[in-house]
Curated annotation (Swiss-Prot):
<feature type="binding site">
    <location>
        <begin position="135"/>
        <end position="138"/>
    </location>
    <ligand>
        <name>4-CDP-2-C-methyl-D-erythritol 2-phosphate</name>
    </ligand>
</feature>
<feature type="binding site">
    <location>
        <position position="10"/>
    </location>
    <ligand>
        <name>a divalent metal cation</name>
    </ligand>
</feature>
<feature type="binding site">
    <location>
        <position position="142"/>
    </location>
    <ligand>
        <name>4-CDP-2-C-methyl-D-erythritol 2-phosphate</name>
    </ligand>
</feature>
<feature type="binding site">
    <location>
        <position position="145"/>
    </location>
    <ligand>
        <name>4-CDP-2-C-methyl-D-erythritol 2-phosphate</name>
    </ligand>
</feature>
<feature type="binding site">
    <location>
        <begin position="64"/>
        <end position="68"/>
    </location>
    <ligand>
        <name>4-CDP-2-C-methyl-D-erythritol 2-phosphate</name>
    </ligand>
</feature>
<comment type="similarity">
    <text>Belongs to the IspF family.</text>
</comment>
<comment type="subunit">
    <text>Homotrimer.</text>
</comment>
<feature type="binding site">
    <location>
        <begin position="37"/>
        <end position="38"/>
    </location>
    <ligand>
        <name>4-CDP-2-C-methyl-D-erythritol 2-phosphate</name>
    </ligand>
</feature>
<protein>
    <recommendedName>
        <fullName>2-C-methyl-D-erythritol 2,4-cyclodiphosphate synthase</fullName>
        <ecNumber>4.6.1.12</ecNumber>
    </recommendedName>
</protein>
<feature type="binding site">
    <location>
        <begin position="103"/>
        <end position="109"/>
    </location>
    <ligand>
        <name>4-CDP-2-C-methyl-D-erythritol 2-phosphate</name>
    </ligand>
</feature>
<dbReference type="GO" id="GO:0019288">
    <property type="term" value="P:isopentenyl diphosphate biosynthetic process, methylerythritol 4-phosphate pathway"/>
</dbReference>
<dbReference type="InterPro" id="IPR020555">
    <property type="entry name" value="MECDP_synthase_CS"/>
</dbReference>
<dbReference type="GO" id="GO:0008685">
    <property type="term" value="F:2-C-methyl-D-erythritol 2,4-cyclodiphosphate synthase activity"/>
</dbReference>
<keyword id="KW-0414">Isoprene biosynthesis</keyword>
<feature type="binding site">
    <location>
        <begin position="59"/>
        <end position="61"/>
    </location>
    <ligand>
        <name>4-CDP-2-C-methyl-D-erythritol 2-phosphate</name>
    </ligand>
</feature>
<dbReference type="GO" id="GO:0016114">
    <property type="term" value="P:terpenoid biosynthetic process"/>
</dbReference>
<comment type="function">
    <text>Involved in the biosynthesis of isopentenyl diphosphate (IPP) and dimethylallyl diphosphate (DMAPP), two major building blocks of isoprenoid compounds. Catalyzes the conversion of 4-diphosphocytidyl-2-C-methyl-D-erythritol 2-phosphate (CDP-ME2P) to 2-C-methyl-D-erythritol 2,4-cyclodiphosphate (ME-CPP) with a corresponding release of cytidine 5-monophosphate (CMP).</text>
</comment>
Length: 159
């Protein structure tokens, strides 16, 4: 059996030009939005990078350029579905995924189960294979000042 591990990280800053945020494919009511070329889903972006990293295929920016207008405001679930195809082509399966959302606000806990279900559906895996947790920075740094959100994701693949 062959194992591969990948790590992904993403961060987006808040903008008053939008309202509500999308994290893990779930829309969350908030008075600000996330500045991004796509929908700004930091969790899916980090997950894409983790899977691509484990496969040795670079990162999300290599495959979906942020200068390409076809990806302007696109739903990030599209990226994850495309990367699932790459995973299948390489004949790897997901053992587990562990995600950490770092945000002072809004609170993520009420939305985590919906996020897990959304990601499991796209990746065609069991919800039990995905862990999502959220933490704050105790009001330190740009996240603590509620200027943005960051996410780390680790995934383990096998074949």
């Amino acid at each position: 059996m062959s194992f591969r591990i990948g790590h992904g990280y993403d961060v987006h800053k808040f903008t008053s030009a939008k309202q509500n945020i999308i994290i893990g494919g779930v829309e969350i009511a908030y008075h600000l939005g996330l500045e991004a070329h796509s929908d700004g889903d930091v969790l899916i972006h980090a997950l894409c990078d983790a899977i691509l990293g484990a496969l040795g295929l670079g990162d999300i920016g290599k495959h979906f350029l942020d200068t390409d207008n076809q990806f302007k405001n696109i739903d990030s679930k599209f990226f994850l579905a495309e990367i699932k195809k790459m995973l299948d082509e390489k004949q790897y399966s997901i053992s587990n995924i562990d995600c950490t959302i770092i945000a002072q606000a809004p609170k993520m806990l009420p939305h985590i189960e919906k996020m897990r279900a959304c990601l499991a559906n796209i990746l065609e895996i069991q919800i039990s294979q995905i862990n999502i947790k959220a933490t704050t920075t105790e009001r330190l740094g740009f996240i603590g000042r509620e200027e943005g959100i960051a996410t780390h994701v680790v995934c383990l693949l096998y074949r």
